[in-house]
Structure formats: structure tokens, C-alpha cells
Amino acid sequence: MATSSFNINELVASHGDKGLLATALVDKTAHEQLEEQLQHQRRGRKVYIRNVLGVKDSEVIRNRYGGKYDLHLTQQEFAPHGLAGVLRLCETLDCLDSFPSSGLRQDLVLDFGGSWVTHYLRGHNVHCCSPCLGIRDKMRHAERLMNMRKIILNDPQQFDGRQPDFCTQPAEDCKVQAHFAISIHGGYDMGFRGLCEAMNAHGTTILKGTMMFDGAMMFDDQGVIPELNCQWRKIRSAFSETEDVTPLSGKLNSTVFSRVRKFKTMVAFDFINESTMSYVHDWENIKSFLTDQTYSYRGMTYGIERCVIHAGIMTYKIIGVPGMCPPELIRHCIWFPSIKDYVGLKIPASQDLVEWKTVRILMSTLRETEEIAMRCYNDKKAWMEQFKVILGVLSAKSSTIVINGMSMQSGERIDINDYHHIGFAILLHTKMKYEQLGKMYDMWNASSISKWFAALTRPLRVFFSSVVHALFPTLRPREEKEFLIKLSTFVTFNEECSFDGGEEWDVISSAAYVATQAVTDGKILAAQKAEKLAEKLAQPVIEVSDSPEASSQTPDDTAEVCGKEREVSELDSLSAQTRSPITRVAERATAMLEYAAYEKQLHDTTVSNLKRIWNMAGGDDKRNSLEGNLKFVFDTYFTVDPMVNIHFSTGRWMRPVPEGVVYSVGYNERGLGPKSDGELYIVNSECVICNSESLSTVTRSLQAPTGTISQVDGVAGCGKTTAIKSIFEPSTDMIVTANKKSAQDVRMALFKSSDSKEACTFVRTADSVLLNECPTVSRVLVDEVVLLHFGQLCAVMSKLKAVRAICFGDSEQIAFSSRDASFDMRFSKIIPDETSDADTTFRSPQDVVPLVRLMATKALPKGTHSKYTKWVSQSKVTRSVTSRAIVSVTLVDLDSSRFYITMTQADKASLISRAKEMNLPKTFWNERIKTVHESQGISEDHVTLVRLKSTKCDLFKQFSYCLVALTRHKVTFRYEYCGVLNGDLIAECVARA
């Protein structure tokens, strides 16, 4: 498994505006923390989330589903109540994952009220019951039809022969039978019992569903679900939120109200600060999911189990069982955590004090207000004076106060309509308490009774008091009016479930039957897969003929055009090949799919970054104009990406374009793509070469190759290029390299030219092979193969129809690494069929051999096998390595005869700036200053490694990077460094040599 790692400075320089966020992570623990996050993401299927989510919303979705799915938040588009939409998608996948996904008819899943187009596009084995209950449902159907057409037009081969599976009937009327069902926010209009009856009609035994949940609905008339930014409110009419004053006779005679649910309490769900459609549902149906537990219907007993309540969403399951159900007490609780700090206070709701209502007040506010009211009470004062005192204290405890110029919220604001009634209720409560306490004191202080009662011993007093209260209840003190009510933080529901459904359900026999059927179905599926694979492998391999006529008759030659997908049936797709019983075919197909997904994510990230810059500069997706503070925005982004720029419609650039740089694409309101000189658009560093989407598309259109992959794993300088030169046959071979520099080196070695037609025909980069027309060959020779993703290597073999690939590379040097730190890279490492080693170097001088051995001993884990522990050198140079400390970049000796390498882009930029200050030729700082990663595969006589900072850099601890740095030279190597860097592997080994 490949490990995804990255350097913070490279991240900042390559990720556009995201680099602004990354700079905050540059500290001593940043690398470890990000690695932990990557490990956390390595699980489950990938789920791409297009909706723009804030930081809090992103945390909600990651906390809920980040452990199950590999979530990719592309932040591409704004959507109404974005988090709710994202949760709905993940809830759908989560509920479907509870059931078998064989694709067989017996494993069909029903979806009550879901989106059929979601299942169609993802290929789910689901039948959707999507009834048209009103204009909203019909609007949704029209929109789904449009979305389906749009997506099919972009990829018709994928959906060829596939039909959407849905009906427009209510769930209880649909005749499709299935054992399993889901209901994603579809139970509001059916209720618990309605869902059970629908399950019975379909023969469904298990249903998983979700719904918005707030336990406070049992207590309050309105509230907020903060995670969803949703406000709910109980209303009395389907058309108005105020009480309907139409006379009863008028309602009964009204043709309008005869069609709506009259006299029922509805719950309206409104999304705060979003002027979008709300959802209105029957409170009785919603309440049933909170209170009901079992329901017996037509020989089946259905029980609901509330599984998870998170972020205002409750996941539940309903399971139906046949036969008799012995009596059993079923108990569950609905909790109200939001009211644990509150107390109920009864206040008058009418002037005659007959009607009262209960309001919630913070316990701290009421306690302090009542305490002051009791201490300041005086029965000789007018009631209004005492009323004003209470109102003043109540206001101070529930309003905004200013302290030292800072405004602070004290307590919680009270409804303006309840404020005076609350104060009046507290006054009545205080007066009543004083009157009752006075009566109690007078009764206790009565002369004859109190003296006689006091003369009794304590046991007699207790006994006498109990007898009197039991025999003469009217002698008790008058019961006080209940003003204060303690609010319970939960409510309990107990139900005795008992049902006589006839014969007892034989669970043991059912288990045996299910196991037998599952084995039979599994064998059928395996046989089908093996048969399809055998048919595929039975096709003969088409060898390349020397005859031009024979070559022209190759079936796919005329169809292979850059960017065009071949028509591959669903059964022959990469996805099908990943399930191949032939291990290497499955491995290669999986790697190709990962490579295609990786390139697609790079493209999506580029689009997301550019769209964000465009929007911040005042642009939108409709007009070709920018209206923001362009200089401020682009100066900010320029600090992390010097290639960020604006091309105006006049043809002028905001900043001078670096010499030799040509932007192939740009971004504006029409998206990312080629632009004309008369357009306004923006660019960044990813717009110079933007081929990720094309690479992804081409790779997905290919099939995993079945040819042999051989790897020559040689040490640095073992003569890999010489070996390629010696075995290359122009009639049957093509040479493929990982990058343009390696291709130029091989062309010079073979053809003494880097740009001749012959050299460019036979020596090409992997990207060039995939993106352009190329002849088919029987063998491909690959240089520096470790810099390629395994999936890209397989795609190259498939495109060239090669039956053999001979790959040269060093498995211990810098391997392919992801440019997107968030991508879960698992299958990038080359998996060869044959491997051979070469442990003799002809390039590295004699003193480099023990240095590399020492580095391997110090850097690699104990027990790790390394070919560098036994490598030898045939070089005649005996001493080549030196080092010296420098104070700054000005002391670096820049000489045109030397090749300069750095570990980081920042140090490289400093050296280039220094070279420009010294007026050195452009060819020097363009070709003679590279990073270690860029210099892999390069061979030079004199090399200088420069480190200009002593801040933490993990690259100096990695054996692969240090190995490449120390093995580029033939004659001399000089290490020039500023300050002491802890863990500097090269400095430690050079010092001990």
C-alpha cells in the first residue's frame, strides 16, 4: 500500500487558495496531524459531495459518516439547505448498505418516497415508489427526468440498456414485492402504522429509514434543529399559521377545505435564512415515530427500533415478524436535552385568570428574580411598586448589557408578549408564599394548641400529626396554586406487546432455508462472473504485423482518437474486471480505476479553486465580468501561487506572464477550458498543463491488460538507460517515460536529438501515449517506472495493446506520490509479474557506497531488505563528497558547470532569485536548478545540494529523497547548508564518513 505524504511548502505552492489554509498548519506537528487525518479517511467507498458546506456543516457530515465512507467535499455548487441534502445522500447509501447488494431479483430493495434517479444513476437494485401527491412531486419528477438526460448524454455507454425502476403509485398501492425497503424522510405523510401497512402489502420484513427529529416536539409548539439550521413550528391549518376563525358550518360547506386535512395540527419545517420551499406534515404521523412501538396487522407484528439520533436526524428500523408474540413489556424514552436548564412557569392567558399557559424560563433567571422578589417584598407597598421591582430584575437577567464597552447577553431573551405576564405571575407567586407562610406561622403560634402540642414528646407529636391529617384532611393548610413546574428531561413510553398470529414462527427452519438459498445464489453469481471472464480471455491477442495493410485493419486503430472513449460494455468494464478471479487482472483494473479517480479529483480541485477565486473577485456563472477588488484578491493568492493571473478582454494580463509560460486553459463564467483573446478569464499554475480530466476519461474507457510486466529493479546509476538502448527494437517497441525530462534524455541517448520526428515517435511520455494517437506495439520499455502510478502503467499497456512491458526503475528511490493530500491512494505501487535486481553502479563514486549504506541503516526500519546494503561501484572516482556551512543564499557558489538541487520549492525559488540577481543566463536557472524530486533520473558531473533553512523538513529524514540527492553526480558532490537541522540524514552521514 502506498503512503500519501506531502511537504507543507509544496502544498502551499500548488493548491491555489487552499494554500492559505495550509500555511496555518506549518508547525512542528503539522505533518503528523495531517497523516493521521489521511489514515482516518482510508476506509469505505468514495462519496463525492458537490454542495458547498461551511466548516461546522463539514464537521457534522464527517463526524456522522466519515468513519464509514471516504467523503470528498469538492465544494462545487451552492444548494438550498446543503447539509440536509448531503445527509440525505449518505443516509440513502447507509440504509442500502444494510441489505445484500448482489443485484439479484430476490435482493431487490424498495424505496418509499425516494429519488429514483439517484438509484438509476448509481446502478442500485432498487424499485422506487415515488407518488405524485401534489405539484411539488410533479416538479421533482420533471427535474429528475432532465438530470437523467443530461448525465446519460455525457456517458451513453454506461447507461446503455439500463432502465429506471420506479412507479408513481403510493407505497400501499404498489404491487412490487421485496423483502427489504428504505424510507429516507418518506414516512412523514404515512406515519408508523402507514409504513407498517405498506410493508405488509409488499411482503417486506425489514425497513430502514430516517427522519428529522427533535424530542422537544413533545413539549413545545416550536423549536430549532441547530445542526440542520431548520426551524419547526406547529400550525393549525394547512393554509394559514393563525387559528382559522371560519364558523364550523362554513368549513363543512367549503369546497376548498373539504380537500385538505381540517382540524389537524401540522408541523412546518422551515430552513432559516433560506427562502426555499418548506415542508409541512401531519403532527400525528410525526408523533407516531416518537411514541409508538409495535403494530399488529394481518398476521404480522411490526416493531420500530430507534437506532441513531445525530445532527437532528433519527435513523430507525422497522422489522416485521409472523406468528404469535408472547406478552412483553416494550419500553423506550424520548429525551429533551435542550430543556435541562429550564423551569416551567404558569402565567395567565386570560384576564379572568381562568386560562393559564406554561412558558419556559432559564432556571438561573427565575431563581435570581424570585430570590430578590422575596427579599424585597413588603405588603404595605402598592402592588405596582413591587411589580416594577420584579420587572426591573427580570429585565436585567434577560437582556443585553454593556460592560467596559463590550455587549454581553445576560440570560436569555423573553418573548415580548410574555414579559409582563411572567412578572405578574412571579408577583402573585411571591404574595401567595408570604400569605401561606404567615398562616402557617399563626397556626403554629396559636396559644393553647401550640403549648399543648409543644409539651408532647417528639414521637407523640409525629404520631398525632399523622392521625389528624389522615382523619381530617380538611384541616390541612390550603393547597397552594402551582406556579412553578419542574420540567422532566425525558418521557417514558411503556407498552405491552401481545399478538396471537396463529402458528409459532419456526426461526430454525427459516435460518436453514436462507442459508441454503444464499449458497445457491452465490454459486450462480460466481459462475456468471467466471463465464464472462472466460469469454473475454478466449479472444486471441492481435499481434502487430510489419505489413502496413495488416496494421490498418486493426479494429480499434480508426476508433482511437484523443479523448474519445471506446465503447465498452458494462460486463467488460474496469468495474467488472475488478471482480475477476484472476488476481492480476483484478489488481490492474482496480489500480486503473484508482488512477482515473485520482486524475478526476485533481481536475475537480482545480475547478473548485478557480471558481472560488472567480467568486471572490466578484464574478458569477452568468456574466463575463469581475466587480471586486481585483488587486487585493489576486495579490493575496499570488503569495501562494505566483502563476495566478487575470486575462482581460482587451488582451492585457494583470501581471506579466513568465517567459516561456503558455496557459492552455482558463476559467470564467463558462467554466474551465480553452479561452479566446477577447475573453475575461483567470488562471493559476494548474492551467499551464490541464489534462487530468482527459487522462481520467481515457483510462476509464480502457480495459485492464493481460500481458506480462517485468521490472528491473536496479540501483542508481546501474545503466538502465544503456540497457534500454541495447534492447530497443523500433519495429516492435516503444519507449515510455514518466516525465518530459526523462524522455529528452533517452532521445538524446538513442537518437542524438530530443525533438526529431523519429525520436518523438519512439520515445514518449505516459501522458502523451494516453492523450494522443499512437501505433500499437507488442512491447513497451518503461524508464523510471516508479514515478508512474500502477494504474497509468496498465493504461499505457492497454492503449498500446502491448503483450509485455519491461520496466526499469529503482524501487527505493522517490516513488509516485499524490499531488492531492486528501486522496486515499492505495494501489499506486507497481506490482510486476517478474523482478530482477541490478546492484552495480557505474555512476556513483566509491565513497558514495558506504554513505548510502549508512543512510539505509539509520533511516530504514530494522529488518528491511535493501539492495543498497550490498551494492558496489565500478567508478574510478574514489572521493567526491564534501560539505560546508553557509550563512545565507548569497554565499552559495553559483557556477554554470555545476548542477544545483534542493529539497523544497522555497529553496529552489531562492536560488533562482539569486541567479537572476547575478545576471546568469536564463538557461542556467531554468535547467541547472531543480528540486530532488525533479532531478530523479538525471546524471551530472558536479552536483551541489543546497539547504537554506534550519526549520523542520521531513524530506531530509526520508531515505528515498536523500538517496536521490546523493546519487546524481559522477565526479563531485557538495552539500551547502544553513544552520543545524535535527534529523538531517545527509549531514549526519557525511560527518561520520
Swiss-Prot record:
Physiological role: Involved in the virus replication. Contains a helicase domain and a methyltransferase domain. The methyltransferase domain is probably involved in viral RNA capping. Involved in the formation of ER membrane spherular invaginations in which RNA replication complexes form.
Subunit relationships: Interacts with RNA-directed RNA polymerase 2a.
GO terms of biological process kind: methylation; mRNA modification; RNA processing
Protein name per Swiss-Prot or TrEMBL: Replication protein 1a
GO cellular component term, pick one: host cell endoplasmic reticulum membrane
Annotated family: Belongs to the bromoviridae replication protein 1a family.
Residues of the (+)RNA virus helicase ATP-binding domain: 687-838
Cellular compartment(s): Host endoplasmic reticulum membrane
UniProt keywords, alphabetically: ATP-binding, Helicase, Host endoplasmic reticulum, Host membrane, Hydrolase, Membrane, Methyltransferase, Nucleotide-binding, Transferase
Domain of life: Viruses
Domain annotation (+)RNA virus helicase C-terminal: ranges: 839-993
Membrane topology of the entry: Peripheral membrane protein
Residues engaged in binding ATP: G714, V715, A716, G717, C718, G719, K720, T721
Domain Alphavirus-like MT: 72-290
SUPFAM superfamilies noted in UniProt: P-loop containing nucleoside triphosphate hydrolases
Matching InterPro entries: (+)RNA_virus_helicase_core_dom (IPR027351), 1a_necrotic_phenotyp-det_dom (IPR021002), Alphavirus-like_MT_dom (IPR002588), CMV_1a_C (IPR022184), P-loop_NTPase (IPR027417)
Methyltransferase: region residues: 51-409
